[in-house]
């Protein structure tokens, strides 16, 4: 399998306090009937449209690289008008001397359940990814770049060809870190199963079929660090 994080150079709201060392702002997908609030809504909608387009372009290239009969088959999940995608802003305040060591973990080890994540941050380090041997490496920050993180759903769609990237956020700087993630997800009733082109006699179906709604319910019933895609793996095949 391939575990991948790509760095790219580029050109309603609910506030949830998850812990004293991380705060986040969630923005749900755009709904026409929701009142749009001036410059903020315009800026967010423009940003979401841009990163959504970027994500779809990347997934189309993935489809071409995998020689899928329809290179848009994965990106169509995100283009769907009922896509469950959303935008999140994370704020990691710099720790103070009295904070316990556990506060150095801004967000614990996990993989994202969605298809992929488009991440951008300021110039403060903190993002780390887990290598196949279990070691952790820091991802150098670059505020002029987007980072593309493979999620569990893409792992299932590609029958394990691409693997969800386990990552975490470390609060180790004397400066505040901020990041923005666009989580690209299918509609709740979108049916996820290994694409036929990714299945062969030597690589049988390795994941059970599920809807995105079913996966969300199963995934969020487990602890953050749990390998949640394992719930749908066919162990004899993967």
Briefly describe each language-model feature range.
Residues 1-238:
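Peripheral, non-catalytic segments flanking oxidoreductase cores
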């Amino acid at each position: 399998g391939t575990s991948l994080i790509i760095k790219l150079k580029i050109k309603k709201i609910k506030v949830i306090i998850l812990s004293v060392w991380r705060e986040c702002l969630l923005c749900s997908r755009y709904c026409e009937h929701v009142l749009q609030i001036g410059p903020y809504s315009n800026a967010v909608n423009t940003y979401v449209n841009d990163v959504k387009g970027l994500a779809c372009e990347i997934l189309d290239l993935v489809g071409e690289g995998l020689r899928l009969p329809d290179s848009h088959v994965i990106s169509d999940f995100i283009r769907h008008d009922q896509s469950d995608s959303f935008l999140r802003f994370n704020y990691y305040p710099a720790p103070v001397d009295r904070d316990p060591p556990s506060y150095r973990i801004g967000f614990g080890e996990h993989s994202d359940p969605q298809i992929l994540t488009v991440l951008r941050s300021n110039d403060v380090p903190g993002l780390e990814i887990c290598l196949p041997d279990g070691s952790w490496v820091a991802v150098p920050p670059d505020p002029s770049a987007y980072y593309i993180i493979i999620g569990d759903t893409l792992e299932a769609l590609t029958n394990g060809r691409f693997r969800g990237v386990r990552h975490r956020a470390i609060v180790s700087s004397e400066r505040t870190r901020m990041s923005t993630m666009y989580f690209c997800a299918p509609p709740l009733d979108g049916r996820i199963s290994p694409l036929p082109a990714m299945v062969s006699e030597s690589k049988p179906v390795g994941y059970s079929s599920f809807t995105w709604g079913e996966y969300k319910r199963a995934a969020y019933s487990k602890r953050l660090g749990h390998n949640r895609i394992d719930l749908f793996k066919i162990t004899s095949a993967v």
